[in-house]
């Protein structure tokens, strides 16, 4: 198996948090026999507004040099492996793309901007999802306990080779996605809601 852990940072890479995160993830890659790649200021996207740096994680979908890996994990530099972890993250992937649910946020996010202390709230989530459901004829997953929309975190995403290829073929153009959800709050134009949406509307095999 040819596996890769990929990280990047657009900005000041001398920040202690970046240095620590990269060091820890590189060590973990060595433990599980995976290749490791950190890119210093690749600035892959620069035309998507303030969230351009966030979309850099999708470089691994589009660039040919990543296409021959069996598995790739993207992780933000503030993601740390559990201390002394020996098990490979790739062993637990049973679908084509793996992503983590935002369990606490799904259940506890405020309903309104006043309750959330910012524009990212359950009411705004509903507007965002409704725009995509109306256009694509899909239903977004909901928490069985609260019926709130499920939220997913794009800070760590695992792909197998099929998942990489399907993402390249099926994912919306970023500009089209941003137009579709307009005029949602700016957060909904970033990589996390974008990836969440693609997994649902493009019928990807994900977990």
Where are these regions (language model features)?
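Conserved donor-nucleotide/metal-binding helix-loop-beta segment in metal-dependent transferases, i.e.
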Residues: 81-130
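N-terminal anchoring/stem segment of glycosyltransferases
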Residues: 1-70, 162
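Short acidic (Asp/Glu) patches
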Residues: 58, 123-143
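A conserved donor-nucleotide-binding helix/loop in the catalytic core
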Residues: 46-75, 80-88, 97-102, 152
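A general structural signal for short secondary-structure junctions and capping/turn motifs
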Residues: 63-65, 88-92, 146-149, 197-198
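Catalytic core and acceptor-binding pocket of nucleotide-sugar-dependent glycosyltransferases
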Residues: 135-207
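A structural signal for short, well-ordered beta-strand segments and their strand-loop junctions
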Residues: 5, 36-39, 73-76, 98-100, ...
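Short, solvent-exposed loop/turn segments at secondary-structure junctions
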Residues: 10-12, 43-44, 79-80, 104-106, ...
């Amino acid at each position: 198996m040819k596996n890769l852990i990929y990280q990047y940072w657009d900005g000041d890479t001398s920040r202690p948090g970046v240095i620590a995160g990269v060091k820890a993830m590189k060590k973990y890659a060595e433990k599980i026999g995976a290749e490791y790649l950190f890119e210093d200021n690749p600035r892959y996207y620069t035309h998507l507004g303030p969230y351009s740096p966030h979309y850099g994680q999708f470089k691994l979908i589009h660039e040919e040099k990543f296409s021959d890996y069996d598995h790739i994990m993207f992780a933000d530099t503030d993601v740390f492996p559990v201390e002394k972890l020996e098990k490979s993250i790739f062993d637990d992937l049973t679908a084509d793309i793996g992503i983590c649910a935002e369990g606490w946020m799904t259940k506890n996010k405020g309903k309104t901007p006043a309750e959330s202390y910012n524009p990212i709230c359950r009411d705004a989530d509903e507007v965002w999802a409704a725009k995509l459901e109306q256009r694509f004829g899909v239903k977004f997953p909901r928490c069985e306990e609260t019926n709130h929309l499920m939220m997913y975190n794009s800070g760590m995403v695992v792909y197998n080779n099929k998942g990489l290829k399907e993402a390249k073929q099926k994912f919306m153009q970023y500009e089209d996605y941003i137009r579709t959800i307009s005029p949602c709050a700016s957060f909904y134009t970033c990589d996390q809601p974008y990836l969440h949406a693609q997994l649902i509307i493009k019928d990807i095999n994900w977990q």
